[in-house]
């Protein structure tokens, strides 16, 4: 069985390579230098190829240099004019990490290479790609309909296309699925899981030593996947594992509450019993929402305020969820969910999720 694939040096494509080898494929990989800031991933890809060869798996590996063209593209991954956004993987600002038409370019090269292998070796060839469901929200070129359409276009534009097919084994899975399958593949192949994944890079903003930041959206998704399988990530982070895990869990909760209208558990938030002088700003956009002189201990388990800041202009929306009639409050600038407003005999009570707030210390 024959397969070609793109090996970025990240955990998704590395997991895919393990899967293909465990299933008995002869694999050829192409890694792309497209002017990405996180070029350390190319070194990690080479390190894993060397590790595989040392253990008896002769994987063909090529590197294509597209940097002279793609470094001109408008993206935080390639342009020094943009900072890499931080936070949850599905937050809107992560669209800055989209490289226009990247996967179409990569897939086109892979398709041409697959056809060449098919004709040279007189065999059918699978183009395997590590795209997964976690990519769908931000990256249109990681969605199944994209590959269905581009596969049809390539077939129309080439001879012998019946010998080439696309395989997207993780299209309905996520990074946790990739890691769980990689554990099985490593056992099958007699490889050390931690060694393989220490030789990967997922971070879009590693430091000069190649250590992962733990703060980019891709980092957060990876950290949560390792946490889900009950293992510490073997890759080196700038901060200790327990700290990057805490940060990732916080980013996940913040996204769930502010963008998906979830509620943090009572008595667990940072600001429930917090009574220092200062302002409470929206954790998403920074708008000042409340001031400490209006904060009081209601005993409900969430930060409570009797009034909003004079310029907050917090939105009030009727909420009929859970069989109740309530007033939801949202940030007027970024439309993030904050909590609810209750009108009680003692006066109004803004019941706010701590995770939605950032505190700015100082006298009012």
Walk through the language-model features, giving the residues of each:
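Gly/Ser/Thr-rich helix-start
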Residues: 11, 36, 131, 211, ...
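Active-site donor-binding loop signature of nucleotide-sugar glycosyltransferases
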Residues: 66, 205, 307
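Glycine-rich nucleotide phosphate-binding loop and flanking beta-alpha elements
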Residues: 135, 226-227, 358
């Amino acid at each position: 069985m024959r397969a070609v694939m793109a090996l970025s040096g990240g955990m998704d494509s590395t997991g895919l390579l393990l899967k293909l080898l465990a299933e008995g494929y002869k694999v050829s990989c192409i890694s792309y230098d497209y002017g990405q800031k996180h070029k350390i991933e190319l070194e990690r890809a080479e390190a894993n190829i060397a590790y595989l060869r040392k253990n008896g798996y002769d994987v063909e590996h090529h590197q294509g240099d597209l940097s002279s063209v793609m470094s001109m593209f408008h993206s935080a991954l390639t342009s020094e004019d943009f900072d890499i956004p931080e936070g949850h993987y599905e937050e809107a600002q992560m669209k800055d990490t989209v490289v226009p038409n990247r996967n179409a370019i990569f897939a086109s090269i892979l398709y041409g290479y697959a056809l060449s292998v098919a004709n040279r070796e007189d065999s059918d060839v699978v183009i395997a790609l590590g795209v997964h469901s976690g990519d769908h929200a931000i990256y249109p070129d990681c969605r199944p309909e994209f590959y269905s359409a581009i596969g049809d276009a390539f077939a129309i534009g080439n001879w012998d296309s019946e010998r080439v097919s696309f395989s997207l084994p993780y299209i309905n899975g996520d990074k946790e699925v990739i890691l769980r399958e990689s554990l099985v593949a490593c056992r099958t192949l007699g490889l050390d899981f931690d060694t393989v994944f220490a030789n990967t890079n997922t971070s879009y903003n590693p430091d000069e030593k190649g250590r992962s930041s733990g703060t980019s959206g891709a980092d957060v998704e990876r950290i949560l996947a390792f946490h889900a399988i009950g293992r510490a990530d073997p890759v080196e982070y700038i901060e200790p594992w327990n700290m990057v895990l805490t940060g990732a869990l916080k980013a996940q909760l913040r996204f769930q509450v502010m963008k998906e209208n979830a509620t943090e558990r009572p008595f667990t938030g940072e600001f429930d019993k917090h009574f220092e002088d200062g302002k409470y700003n929206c954790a998403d956009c920074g708008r000042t929402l409340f001031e400490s002189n209006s904060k009081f201990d209601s005993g409900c388990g969430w930060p409570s305020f009797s009034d909003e800041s004079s310029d907050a202009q917090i939105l009030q929306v009727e909420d009929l969820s859970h069989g109740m009639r309530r007033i939801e409050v949202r940030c007027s600038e970024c439309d993030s969910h904050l909590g609810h407003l209750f009108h009680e005999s003692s006066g109004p009570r803004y019941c706010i999720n701590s995770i939605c707030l950032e505190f700015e210390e100082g006298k009012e």
